[in-house]
Amino acid sequence: MVVTPDDAHGDERFDRRLGLVGALSIGLGAMLGGGIYVIAGTAAGMIGPALVMAYLATGLLTIFTAINYAELACSIPKQGGGYTFAQDTIGGFPAFLTGWFLFIGNIVACGLYALAVAHTIGVFIPEASPQILGLIAIGIIIVTFITNYASLKGVTGVLGILNVIQSIILFSFIAVGFFFVKPENISLVHPELGLFTFMSTVSFIYISFVGFELITTASEEIKEPARNIPRAIMLTLLIATLIYMAAALVLVGVTPYTEIADSHTPISVVYEIMLGPGAFYLALAGMAASNYAALNATFLATARIAYSMGRDRYFPTILESVSKKRKTPIPALILTLILVSLFASSGNVDLVAHLSDFGYLIGLSIVNYSVIVLRRKGLSVPGTFKGPFFPIVPILGIITCLMLVPTLNISALQLGGILTVAGLVVFLLYGWNRNRDYVDGLEEQLLEKQNLDIGKSITHQE
């Protein structure tokens, strides 16, 4: 069978309804969520005004992984994103581990975004307790589930509207903020600033830069994937990096970084300093829109990963079921609803960031290696995007991910170890037989190759 760039490995149960704008909505909806509105204050407290350079450095380090994702998505445009890339190239336990870490990272991130939206609503509820905020978050998650259940078109429509709202507020914050920036605030130096602290900040904000990954989880629903996916990935990373840098400059320039350190609403705080109390609520609306957009995009991607791992028998096979009418993976959406709700009922921002960073860094390092395997096995689809300077770019992608892992704090590494053990349990319960089939297949291929080589040798001797 001849595979074209636009239908390679496709799944006819999904409709290709998204163009470049729709794909961008998914990527930007995730990248411009909790990253700048929620964790930027904590990051500023870690390194001060050097936060601007930290966002630039993270964007530059991430570009290698983005290029590799673009190439993989063109040759393997299937639901599941990074997990599917690893599964179709490497296979076995490494593929499961990739999917596991990306799945858990997305689940926890959804909890963060839901809680962030709940906190914006909680401002208007006198003495709102954590339990009430948790219930609000679960209600928001249920609404997100219903939107995703209805259709992908509904999700991208919501993302498009929310992206417009958050973009107006964020761009206004940047445009107005430049007039309030004070050189003396930017010239401040954090007393603990050093290479390790700088890299620790980069790893901490890394969660803000993986939104492009979510584009590939909906590959089977994007029109002309060979053309639109690479463009959407690179544009998402470029636009988000520039916005992050500009917003960070305003955050640390308008007021001393110590005023927003450890704040989970830094933009609202700075908005109020610039324009008064009324602006606080304007920024709050932007925070709500931004985080709800991120929740929708990440919720969508998480369900797609669960669907893909069910399809490949690493998760229960019921998760691969797709509604014929709505073209959505209902069981996978329900699983995502349950797990995200459980986390949102008791989660916190720091835990989310640490868990997500560990999972993404480990998972993406394996995905970067998948490009090397893709090329060596000759699986690339002719006429599609291919990253330059092979194999330098994939190797740099692996290095830039793994070198950040040791800079995570000890709690992140401990939690990462617990997640790894949990993944082993899930693999033994569901993936072991699947892995045996994979190994048996490799053994059969090796035996066939050996028999072929022996046959050629005998023929040559005759």
Q: What is each of the regions a protein language model found here?
A:
Residues 169-173, 306, 356-383, 420-439:
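Hydrophobic alpha-helical segments of multi-pass membrane transport proteins
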Residues 3-15, 51-52, 56, 127-132, ...:
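Helix-loop-helix junctions that connect adjacent transmembrane segments
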Residues 84-85, 91, 122-127, 202, ...:
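TM-loop-TM module centered on a large, flexible mid-protein loop between adjacent transmembrane helices
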Residues 359-360, 389-462:
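A generic transmembrane alpha-helix motif of multi-pass inner-membrane proteins
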Residues 158, 192, 318-327, 364-412, ...:
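C-terminal membrane-solvent junction of multi-pass transporters and transport-like membrane proteins
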Residues 1-40, 45-50, 62-67, 78-79, ...:
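Membrane-interface "cap" regions at the ends of multi-pass membrane proteins
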Residues 42-46, 54, 63-141, 145-149, ...:
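Hydrophobic transmembrane alpha-helices that form the core helical bundles
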Residues 132-181, 192-194, 233-237, 356-366, ...:
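Membrane-interface loop-to-helix entry segments
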